[in-house]
A protein has these predicted regions:
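Conserved NAD(P)H cofactor-binding loop of Rossmann-fold oxidoreductase domains
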Residues: 59-60
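Conserved small/polar residues in nucleotide/adenosyl-binding loops
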Residues: 134-139
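Hydrophobic alpha-helical segments, chiefly the membrane-spanning helices
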Residues: 145-152
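Rossmann-like NAD(P)(H) cofactor-binding subdomain of soluble oxidoreductases
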Residues: 63-133
């Protein structure tokens, strides 16, 4: 099985390299120049999609100061994340993806956004969300319960 990662920042690169450490070949792409001794860095989204079975999308979703999840925000006016990069990547992936492949979105997305804004951009294959990826020591120390959900 060939794995792809689009977005090799603070979440994408550590996760991609961890997948390599488990014995898988990983293709990766980022809009910024990246280097890795483990991940096979590609020059385009198209290359990653065409050479991978599962493609993880780990692009940033910037947010306003104070909405990073560290402090409660229920007393503040609701603010959404900026999904422009996610939308661009999903739209580009959809041009090249095949029905038997899977797109897995791991970027931070608020509830309802997948169904309302992002899933409609992926028409040629399955889009899954909320797959758990951890960086650093969190993977070793975090208990995990995985529950099923509704298909989108």
């Amino acid at each position: 099985m060939l794995i792809g990662f689009i977005g090799l920042g603070k979440l994408g690169m550590p996760c991609a390299e961890a997948v390599v450490d488990k014995g898988y070949h990983v293709n990766g792409y980022d809009i910024l120049p990246r280097q890795s001794t483990k991940v096979d860095i590609k020059s385009s989204i198209q290359e990653v999609v065409e050479q991978s079975d599962i493609i993880f999308v780990a692009t940033p979703t910037p947010h306003e100061e104070g909405y990073d999840g560290r402090d409660p925000t229920s007393h503040l006016p609701p603010k959404d994340f900026n999904y422009d990069s996610v939308k661009e990547v999903l739209t580009e992936c959809n041009k090249y993806v095949r029905q038997e492949q899977v797109l897995a979105l791991v970027s931070t997305v608020l509830p309802g956004t997948i169904r309302r804004e992002l899933a409609p951009l992926v028409t040629n294959t399955k889009l899954i969300y909320n797959c758990l990826l951890y960086t650093s020591d969190a993977a070793d120390d975090t208990p995990c319960v995985d529950l099923g959900g509704r298909r989108i």
